[in-house]
């Protein structure tokens, strides 16, 4: 297996009430600095496009990383809360670790953080091929598909979930 190795700077730890099955028991979810997310973002979401892997608002977000050991980042998610609305962006898990519960743990941790911050709902812009993943976790489409990036034919849908 190939891992991304970074000089990981953990900025906070918190235990999340998420199930840890046998395949995810060695995975830790930690708050990290924004720069710790870029390697996985590029590897999964925008290969060869580092310019698309940083967000202008990264410094205002809360960033979570799934790690193996001390510095093997295998998944990331970035959360932005604005009053009652929370939005996550740049959610990615390395291919070798998909279907093992890593993404579910990251998503549950982001939802927990959003609820703790007082958000009434959480949402993301999802590609059509990922809609079923979000629907299975209680999200529903909140509007018609749209093109997110100028000049791109890739469509997205806003997926939203109420937080209890």
What do the predicted segments below correspond to?
Residues 65, 72-80, 85-92:
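Conserved beta-strand in the GNAT
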Residues 113-127:
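Conserved GNAT acetyl-CoA-binding A-motif
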Residues 123-125, 140-158:
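Conserved catalytic-core motifs of GNAT/GCN5-like acyltransferases
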């Amino acid at each position: 297996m190939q891992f991304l190795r970074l000089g990981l700077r953990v900025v906070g730890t918190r235990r999340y009430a998420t199930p840890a099955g046998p395949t995810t028991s060695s995975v830790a979810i930690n708050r990290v600095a924004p720069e710790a997310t870029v390697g996985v973002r590029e590897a999964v979401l925008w290969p060869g496009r580092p310019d698309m892997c940083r967000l202008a608002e990264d410094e205002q977000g809360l960033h979570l990383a799934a790690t193996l050991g001390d510095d093997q980042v295998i998944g990331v998610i970035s959360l932005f809360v604005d009053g009652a609305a929370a939005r996550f962006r740049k959610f990615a898990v390395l291919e070798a670790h998909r279907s093992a519960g890593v993404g579910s743990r990251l998503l549950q941790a982001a939802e927990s953080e959003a609820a703790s911050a007082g958000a009434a709902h959480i949402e993301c812009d999802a590609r059509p091929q990922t809609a079923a993943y979000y629907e299975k976790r209680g999200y529903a489409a909140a509007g018609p598909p749209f093109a997110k990036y100028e000049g791109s034919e890739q469509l997205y849908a806003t997926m939203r979930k109420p937080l209890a």
